[in-house]
């Protein structure tokens, strides 16, 4: 599957430019109001379960939607997903001038494994 290999390379390259944060640290920053968590999964994935207090902006539209929903380029934005999309989204936001962007390591699976809350 060469397409998957190229995708994995793209994700690996993005991760070199993006700071990763643990689910526990992401939860603490969300709960303190220090950060916004952005779920970059598609709406149908979001509807199946998501992090309470997170904002949904799919990977396909985040560049169009981000300024309307998070205008401050200095705000801490933590992207998460179910795979590598959060690293790609975080890198894209950095290129748009957002200065405090993170990708949550392990995505929603790691969040659930840490027994952090989800809702649907």
What are the roles of these predicted feature ranges?
Residues 39:
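N-terminal glycine-rich beta->alpha transition that marks the start or flank
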Residues 1-35, 43-78, 84-120:
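Rhodanese-like catalytic fold shared by cysteine-dependent sulfurtransferases
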């Amino acid at each position: 599957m060469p397409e998957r290999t190229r995708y994995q390379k793209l994700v690996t390259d993005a991760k070199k430019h993006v700071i990763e944060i643990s689910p526990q640290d992401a939860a603490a920053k969300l709960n303190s109001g220090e950060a916004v968590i952005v779920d970059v999964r598609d709406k149908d994935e979001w509807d199946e379960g998501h992090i309470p207090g997170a904002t949904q902006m799919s990977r396909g539209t985040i560049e169009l939607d981000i300024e309307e929903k998070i205008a401050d380029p200095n705000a801490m934005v933590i992207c998460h997903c179910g795979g590598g999309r959060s690293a790609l989204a975080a890198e894209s936001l950095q290129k748009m001038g957002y200065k405090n962007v993170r990708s949550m390591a392990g995505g929603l699976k790691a969040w659930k494994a840490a027994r952090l809350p989800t809702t649907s």
